Swiss-Prot record:
Coiled coil: none annotated. Its main location: membrane. GO terms for molecular function: protein transmembrane transporter activity. This is Protein translocase subunit SecE. It comes from Buchnera aphidicola subsp. Baizongia pistaciae (strain Bp).
Amino acid sequence: MIKATKLKKKYDKLKIAKWSFLGILIILFILSNHYYIKHSNIFQNILLTSLTILSTGLIFLTKSGKKFLIFTKSAIHETKLITWPNFKDTLHVTFTVIIVTILLALILWGLDNILIWFISLITSLRL
């Protein structure tokens, strides 16, 4: 029981250290982007890229980062299981959507003209 509490305290300290270091890296990223804007682009790009890689690596060492990595891997696995339609099916669906859209547009246009005619008959505007 005592070992478990010590291990938990050690884990909590490590977790706090990781997130603190990550916060410091983000602050460094913002400050370096602000202060080194007058320096050469190569220096600025190298610094910002290294800070980004370091902070991303540190994020993936945390518990939340590991969960995100597992979620990403399972999402990629699920996309590989999807059966995508072939060209023929895609073409048929596309033409069906186009034809239905044109038919509905013609129906709405006809209803609009009938309503305009009916309203002009009632108000005797005779358009």
